[in-house]
Amino acid sequence: MDYQTDVTEDNVQIRGRARSVEGKKHNGSGLTGVKRHAVSETSQKSQQGTGNGTMTNIAEEQTITVTYNFNF
């Protein structure tokens, strides 16, 4: 949910045109960081034993990251 508030695609595109090289590097590192955090959170949840809940959460988080990849 926080990613939707932080996206502001219009501002990102305007700044991205002026700073295309820097913007791509920062966006790439940010997406990798999001994926790493998602994996760590799902691994901790899987240890708690809520198997079915973790699987649905993993699917939702992966779809969110994929949509942001297409937006960038």
UniProtKB/Swiss-Prot annotation:
| Record-given protein name | Probable movement protein p8
Query: According to the UniProt record, which cysteines are disulfide-bonded?
Result: none
| Superkingdom of origin | Viruses
Report the family membership. Belongs to the carmovirus/necrovirus/panicovirus movement protein p8 family.
Q: Where is the composition biased (Polar residues)?
A: 40-58
What this chain does, per the entry, is described as: Cell-to-cell movement.
- Which residue stretches belong to region Disordered? 16-58
Lineage from the top down? Answer: Viruses, Riboviria, Orthornavirae, Kitrinoviricota, Tolucaviricetes
